[in-house]
Amino acid sequence: MSNIEQQVKKIVAEQLGVNEADVKNESSFQDDLGADSLDTVELVMALEEAFGCEIPDEDAEKITTVQLAIDYINAHNG
């Protein structure tokens, strides 16, 4: 597991109040982890802060699973 993958899973668990062991790469934030739209906005903000990148709204809407978040950070993290 990469450092980015570990960090993303930790942030997801903290933001959504779930056990880190329950955060799988294929987990959907809304369907599997119980996030609502406000949770996902806060999650994106936490990812932006943690990785020092900006995630435009049109991209944030497409990040619906843990793996998509990991892929986005890997592609856009300096």
From Swiss-Prot:
PTM info: 4'-phosphopantetheine is transferred from CoA to a specific serine of apo-ACP by AcpS. This modification is essential for activity because fatty acids are bound in thioester linkage to the sulfhydryl of the prosthetic group.
GO molecular function: acyl binding; acyl carrier activity
Residue intervals of the Carrier domain: 2-77
Name of the protein in its database record: Acyl carrier protein
GO biological process: lipid A biosynthetic process
Cellular compartments annotated: Cytoplasm
Family: Belongs to the acyl carrier protein (ACP) family.
Keywords: Cytoplasm, Fatty acid biosynthesis, Fatty acid metabolism, Lipid biosynthesis, Lipid metabolism, Phosphopantetheine, Phosphoprotein
Coiled coil: none
GO terms under cellular component: cytosol; membrane
Keyword Acyltransferase: no
